Amino acid sequence: MTHSSFIQILWKCLFLFLPCTILAQERPSLGHWIAEDQSGIMDFTIREDTLELIVPEGLTLWYKDRLTGDYEISYHICMVMNGGKHDRLSDMNCFWAANDPKHPGKLLARSTWRNGVFRNYNTLTLLYVGYGGNDNATTRFRRYYGQFYDVDETRIKPLIKEYTDPAHLLKPNQWYQIQIRVQDNCTTFLVDGEELFRLPLEAGAGDGHFGLRLLQNHVRFTNFRIEHLN
């Protein structure tokens, strides 16, 4: 069995073995994920292999394992727009290669402090795509340099590339396939097979954690997979 196949099976098993009846004081488990939830009242449900999230404020959902070497992350995601209170067509975002310069190899050391507040992620080194950000007006790629936090704010997260055309903004209730690849000292970001972003990396700069980043919206997330390429 390949590592990527194992991750897919683990994802499904974590959901399938959840109890069908949940007492009022109990919550289903997010399994291999850590939530940093600004609101404290983020709601999620798990149906078969799909995670549904209703997010009142900022939320980062970190995959617990730190990824190293050459790898590909892939998943499907949909912005739900059915008239709900938090159904907002904006911010289908993600982090990858995330690290905390003050706590090398221990990204979750300041998880409670970050608490889903977007500015607090300026303390990290990472790669970031904000797809359909600014109320679905922009799709942007940035690289964060957390070492400049409280030193030089203008150098923390330079913009690498941006789209503003409708073809590269969000559509309601549409499923998207996301592929993030780190390989041969380069990273790429693809949506439905189209490469939107590419960036050369220094050796080891692609190592770190993946995080799904959401803001005041309602999403469905499934088919999460990690494939090690080396």
Label the predicted regions.
Residues M1-E26:
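Bacterial Sec-dependent N-terminal signal peptides
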Residues Q25-N230:
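Extracellular glycan-recognition regions
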